[in-house]
Structures are given as structure tokens and as C-alpha cells.
């Protein structure tokens, strides 16, 4: 059976449980990601860091905070923070309402594709197939 070329799912933000690991169900091979809901006063039980993986933390709903190398940083809704591998981190909720985060992680490639400076360097444009977008 051939692997799917794409995978689609729907996760209503208000239905997110404590932690929803989505990488495997989505068939991801190079990106790890999850949705996390912390109730007031909840958060990671310990700090951690990585050898090579960087992470991106996005506050989707509510206001929480992240501790980076011992410094607490507020994360109101819409905040996006990239954290390098060696930084100790812990995510939590010190507010009075639930907070929902998206967490993404990836290991850098040994070499960026096609000599580019980003992973987008392996993009193959087809300018003959331009999608039409309709106003609603």
C-alpha cells in the first residue's frame, strides 16, 4: 500500500484534551507536533532540552508562560517562540483560564536542500498551474 500524499484532520480547539500527539496520526516523517491544553496552575512537570531538535511554541488560545533557561516569559494568545536545542524549557499556565498551545519540533537536516538557506529550498514551482481564489 502506497503512503498517502497528504493527510487532513480536524481538531476543534475547544475539544483539545490535555495533550494531543498528532505527528504519527498525520503520517509526519520529519516534523513532530502536538496540541496541549493546560488548566490554570498546570504545566510541564520538569524542564528539558534537546541535543539537536529545535522547537516552536505557539499560543493558540488563552495566556500562559514558558520558562527558558530559568527565565519566565509571558505567552499571550498569538505568541510564537522558537527555542534552540540546548535551552532548558518548560511550558505552563499561570493564568486563571485554560491555555492551548501548538508545539512543533524538527531536527535540522545535515545539509539544506539544493544549496538553499532554508528547507524551502527544495520547492519545485509550477507557474503554469496557478490556483484561482474566489472572494466569498
Please annotate each region the language model reported.
Residues 70-86:
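Short acidic-glycine-tyrosine-enriched beta hairpin
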Residues 35-36, 79, 89:
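Hydrophobic/aromatic beta-strand elements that line small-molecule binding cavities or substrate pockets
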Residues 27, 65, 85-111:
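Ligand-binding loop in jelly-roll beta-barrel domains
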Residues 19-21, 34-50:
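Conserved short histidine dyad/triad with adjacent acidic residue
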Residues 30, 51-52:
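Short, small/polar residue-rich loop motifs at catalytic or cofactor-binding pockets
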Residues 52-54, 58-64, 69:
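Glycine- and acidic-residue-biased ligand/ion/polar-headgroup-sensing regions
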Residues 1-31, 116-136:
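A short, N-terminal "cap"/entry segment at the start of jelly-roll beta-barrel domains
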